Amino acid sequence: MSKKISALSAGSLVKLNENGVAKKYIMLGYNHYGKAEVTLLRKDAVGNRAYNACQNGYNVYNGNSLDSFCNEQHIQCLDPIIRACLVNVPIPTTDGHVNGTWSATVRNLMRKCFSLSAAEVGNGGSDGTAFSYLSTQANRIAYQDETTTAVYWWLRSPNSGYNNDAYFVSTDGSVDYDNVYRGYYCARPALALSSEILVSDSADSSGCYTIASAPAGEEYQKVNGVWMRMC
């Protein structure tokens, strides 16, 4: 038996393969961005990277190091059937500082994979709506991949007071801000996926639901546990 992924409650765990290795994602909600999508947040953080490794004093998310990693690099490690089910959604994003000048304008960037905003983790602001699951500090804590070591992870929100700074979630789940070139903070990608994906009817022994089938399933076949595109 299987059921729609949209039927899962917030906080449920779903396994997605990254380069053929199962990783855990947290169900955050359904239709949050108005595209009939489900939003999944990676349970663990991914490596260390700067918010903006190229330009100090430039805390703009659009096209920066963090944005490029999420929407270009991270997507490529997912199984092809999951990539085919990604949904472009409008993520509210504050412009930030450009060459020292602050712009509070919030624009909707179209993204399939992205970093959450300070507003979306319950810290207030105009760049998004909070996910209820992330309203408590404990639920915001992320760990280095497959470890019990809590890490700092970047949000996409720039800080208005300092052109060098952007917001992040600390190891205790609180929200703070720091310099955009800090390379020892982590990315924690969120995915927007089709709500038509079917998952297992119950969680497995690790407490996770697994992908049973997907809208693009007619193009793919599972070979040795990995989804492969059939020509």
Where are these regions (language model features)?
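Collagenous Gly-X-Y triple-helix signature in extracellular proteins
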Residues: 1-231
